[in-house]
Amino acid sequence: MNFITGLVSVSFRPLSAEEIIKITKNAGLDAIEWGGDLHVPAGDLDAARAVAEKTRAAGLLMPEYGSYYRLGVSAPEEIDGVAACARALETDTVRVWAFHKGSLNVTEEEYLRAVADAKRICAAYPDLRFCTECHNNTLTDDYRANLRLIEDVAMENFGAFWQPNQYRSHAYNLESARALAPYTNALHVFAWEGNEKYPLAFHRDRWKEYLDIFAEKARAENVNLMLEFMHDNDPKSLGETARTLRSFIENV
């Protein structure tokens, strides 16, 4: 099973890159998704190279870059700085955001602008895979809208990240996982219900079902399981949370 465990660096924005590397290594995780807002700002190649060198020296992977490029919203030239940082990190996967409105609030012109932008960046950087954040108040706020976007972009290097929607039912999230699994190579892992955050073990049964769905993909290629925003926002809890995540994988 090719599940890669890791940490999303924005989970602990106050920490330095060096501190992020240390706690990730100490927790026994495999990888870090570096965020493009603080630890590796888009276009800052010096920062990207320095962070990449330190991450590799610690024996950690960098399977994805968490950019804040918004399809159809960001200035078109901003993708160049994003792509440059991804290459400096030697990752082939870049997280992007799908517009700045929910799927039911967007106009057709706005939607088509986001689709055209996705096509543009995928064509400009065929060596990179661009994956949308699965998030409310974007075009991926519902898995059916997410599928429509993937189908309308229709580029081989365009896909999705997945995470459970904390404001929807478990049944909905299972439907979402089944629908998006073929297009997904990274998951953001947490245990939330609405605005309440819980220890990851609280959703052990739910994550067993989610990982069973993504297991088929993980038999053929790497699927990244990236811990995001711990229940207590305390770096000291990362080790326990990482052990919980590994126990999930052992039972798939």
Regions found by a protein language model. Give the residues of each.
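Active-site groove signature of glycoside hydrolases
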Residues: T91-V106, P126-N136
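N-terminal pre-domain/capping segments
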Residues: M1-T93, M155, G159, P182-T184, ...
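Acidic-and-aromatic substrate-binding clefts and catalytic sites of carbohydrate-active enzymes
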Residues: V10-A17, G35-A47, Y69-E77, K101-V106, ...
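Conserved active-site loop/cleft motifs that coordinate metal ions or position small ligands
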Residues: A186, N222-M230
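A short helix->loop->beta-strand "cap" motif at the edges of active sites that frequently abuts
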Residues: L60, T91-D92, L128, E216-N224
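P-loop/Walker A phosphate-binding loop and immediately adjacent motor/lid segment at beta-alpha junctions
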Residues: L200-L225
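Acidic/histidine-rich catalytic cores of soluble enzymes
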Residues: T5, A31-I32, Y65, C122-W207
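Active-site cleft segment of glycoside hydrolase catalytic domains centered on the general acid/base Glu
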Residues: S103-A118
